[in-house]
Amino acid sequence: MTRADFIQFGAMIHGVGGTTDGWRHPDVDPSASTNIEFYMKKAQTAEKGLFSFIFIADGLFISEKSIPHFLNRFEPITILSALASVTKNIGLVGTFSTSFTEPFTISRQLMSLDHISGGRAGWNLVTSPQEGAARNHSKSNLPEHTERYEIAQEHLDVVRGLWNSWEHDAFIHNKKTGQFFDQAKLHRLNHKGKYFQVEGPLNIGRSKQGEPVVFQAGSSETGRQFAAKNADAIFTHSNSLEETKAFYADVKSRAADEGRDPSSVRIFPGISPIVADTEEEAEKKYREFAELIPIENAVTYLARFFDDYDLSVYPLDEPFPDIGDVGKNAFQSTTDRIKREAKARNLTLREVAQEMAFPRTLFIGTPERVASLIETWFNAEAADGFIVGSDIPGTLDAFVEKVIPILQERGLYRQDYRGGTLRENLGLGIPQHQSVLHSSHH
């Protein structure tokens, strides 16, 4: 298997979005996070754009300070099951935690979704970093970082073991002889580990794609190692081309060290493209959104990087002030970059504060510009594909209608779906049943 021939995309559907004040935009439906129509429309738009999958993020704890989307939203397995019935080819990926679920339940839910959708299910495996999540699951505290990954490894091994309970042709349904299944093709797990004791077998068989695709998003040392060993696909951030390229090379070489074919691991940085017919229009879309964050909050946020220096004494709409070396000890590289950018682009204090509070994406501008950036990242081996966020209304539609055709013209993007399963559309093979892999040891 070689590197994917085509760039691939996943669409993150995130209700009212990932910011504190985005819901106040006139075009945003403030109930989007629990509006099934909103999710269906987004999923269908992504499918029209031949995206490989849609992605539903999740969390297990909120407080009064959480962003609006977190306060009131769908749980992934139910919304993905609903979306399965209004889509045909697009993958359905959801976040589930290994710290607060039973492997039997997760393996069953995901395999059910895989059957409902005809082989389109994916699991974004997380270990849940919040103390509050422990308190919502009858646990007094959260296991520490390394232990959470130990639990995750055993949890995933059990889930994959359960997915191998039945061989793909175990159910023979012979009405004449009355034989419903072939007993030799049923395997009981009998797992007894440090964290889980699971007998099995699972009460649902293999799916059209064998088993769901496993995604992971660890960027810590432990997280990268875990992802390189276990994941079919990996999510990451896209702060800069150099940084993302380094992450890509690092994870692929770790996968090779684990004895895996590095090209069987797909890497997806997250981007939030803002596309418009002119640079000015794209900039205006960005500003409209950035301006929703109260300017006082944005200036206070910016001041954090400058030792909480009082920036409110400076006029907002004049060039960014010269404040000397304030903040040098705490965030030197960040403050240097802020000052450099402000000078080079002649930004006002207001603009600098807005860009820090609602980061300005690299992927902004005309369709040609955004398509070329995507091409550059793909060719530079920083990505096999991208997770596309679309907090700003209309941005997913614009991307599908204007950027996708350019990528198709350049021979970088498919003209049609390869098949109906998520594995086919990611260019990944169907995993062999474990009985085949282990038969040489019997």
Swiss-Prot record:
It comes from the Bacteria. GO terms for molecular function: monooxygenase activity; oxidoreductase activity, acting on paired donors, with incorporation or reduction of molecular oxygen. Pathway: Amino-acid metabolism. Induction: Induced when methionine is the sulfur source, but not by sulfate. Keywords: Flavoprotein, FMN, Monooxygenase, Oxidoreductase. It catalyses: (R)-N-acetyl-S-benzyl-L-cysteine sulfoxide + FMNH2 + O2 = N-acetyl-S-hydroxy-L-cysteine + benzaldehyde + FMN + H2O + H(+). Coiled coil: none annotated. CDD domains: Nitrilotriacetate_monoxgenase. Disruption phenotype: Reduced growth with methionine or methionine sulfoxide as unique source of sulfur. Its EC number is 1.14.14.-. Disulfide bonds: none annotated. Involved in a cysteine salvage pathway from S-alkylcysteine. Catalyzes the C-S bond cleavage in N-acetyl-S-benzyl-L-cysteine sulfoxide leading to N-acetyl-S-hydroxy-L-cysteine and benzaldehyde. This pathway is likely important in the catabolism of alkylated cysteine generated by proteolysis of alkylated glutathione formed in the detoxification of a wide range of electrophiles. Has much less efficient activity with N-acetyl-S-methyl-L-cysteine sulfoxide as substrate. Belongs to the NtaA/SnaA/DszA monooxygenase family. This is N-acetyl-S-alkylcysteine sulfoxide monooxygenase. It comes from Bacillus subtilis (strain 168). The gene is cmoJ.
